[in-house]
Amino acid sequence: MKVNYLHENETGYKVFLYIFYVCSFLMLSITAYGVYAMLQEWSVDGKYVMGEVLVKTEFPFPHFAKLTTWLFFATIIGWYCCSRIGWKRTVKLYTWKMALLQLMLLGLAVICLYEVLYNFMVLNAQITAGIIDGHVPDIDSLTIAYPDASRPWNLIFATKMFLAGFLISAHAFYLSTRPRKSVEDINP
């Protein structure tokens, strides 16, 4: 059975390319907004909570999706589109380059999985501690003062971003271990 890979002249390729452009625009605009808001908070208070503004901002209207959800979604969908349209760039990776890439992807997947589990456990512990103390905490405001107390991370933001990193690196590792396409597949 011959597998048909996407080529530039096919409609499917163009669909993936345009969706990738939309996802890239979403990622860049959300990141720019987050950096701007973080710098504003830093200039006023002298500290900031990484990702807090993205967790507390709902878009396009109240009680809809938060910016972290949009960023997570755009990152995952954008990566999938990139993996579908960018297969030609990986065809010529052989031997030591591919082995090095696979080791880096495996390492990144393990680190991201550890961070997801760690952040999720800390999040659950803080929720449980709040309930034991007699009040349900605002989940969107829970932070961890790691690695620096003056620059804590919002736990929802950290969990979603490291989950996206894990999914992308695990998928890339999976793709890198599949049977290789041949150079003849580049030009149909």
Predicted regions and their residues:
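Membrane-water interface of alpha-helical transmembrane segments
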Residues: 7-24, 66, 94-102
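Hydrophobic alpha-helical membrane-insertion segments
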Residues: 19-36, 101-122
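Membrane-helix interface motif
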Residues: 31-49, 116-133
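Cytosolic juxtamembrane helix at the C-terminal end of the final transmembrane segment
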Residues: 2-16, 81-93, 120-127, 159-188
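Loop-to-transmembrane helix junctions at the membrane interface
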Residues: 82-112
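Hydrophobic core of alpha-helical transmembrane segments in multi-pass integral membrane proteins
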Residues: 28-29, 71-80, 108, 165-171
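Membrane-interface segments at the starts/ends of alpha-helical transmembrane spans
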Residues: 48-69, 138-159
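Canonical alpha-helical transmembrane segments
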Residues: 59-91
